[in-house]
Amino acid sequence: MPQPLRIGFFLDGFTLKKVNDYYRNVHRFHSCLDFRSLRLWVESQAIRYFEGDKFRELQMESHYYHPYRDPHVFARDCEGVLKLEHVLEPAGYSVHFNNPAEAGCVGPNLLLMEDALLFAMYRKLDAVVLLSTQGEYAPLPDRLRLMGIPTLVLGWDFVYPKAKSYVRWKTDSCLRRSCAHYVAMEKILDNDLNSKAPRGFFFQCEHPFSKGRNPRPKVAVGRDPHAPRRLN
């Protein structure tokens, strides 16, 4: 019986932050990615790209790399980060913070590349799935290929108006060329069938780690919320 296919799913939190901002504020779905649905979709696609749809048991570890420092240590700007952590862990992700970053700086967490290479060096992986658009990770697929490990990159390319100009967000060309397989996620997600979890990729309800979220029900001022409602 063949050994399980061991996949490492490495998610660049800096890219996902920009992508979620786009889908929440600009795109017609006005929602954020559902992490559990994303992970399950990646599992199915890993078999397709790395095994050609041949049946093989799969083992996948999912890792989310924050662009922010650990709020448990530095205790700054932690409200939204902690809420996101409480969403990621139940969805099956290990969370890694960007502690080498300076205060106030937000960017790709390069510990992602170090960890992926370390897993590969110790033969813990057969293939890697990288969700990122950032050129900082462009050397990773080539280094993994030298160890016999192919890389599937999930990237985006979209444009939207902002103020008097346009914002263009796209996958770095070097990262795209160096990987074994590339998926244009904007084409996968831009489908009404994918607009609601669990069938699709997006949260059905309000963004669960929004700073402005108020979990308490709205109550009319001056009215007892437990009083029976009068019927007209």
Predicted region positions:
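Intrinsic, low-complexity polybasic segments
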Residues: 213-215, 221-227
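Single, functionally critical "micro-switch" positions that shape active/binding sites
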Residues: 11, 133, 218
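Domain-level signal for Mg2+-assisted phosphodiester chemistry and nucleotide/NA-binding surfaces
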Residues: 1-106, 157
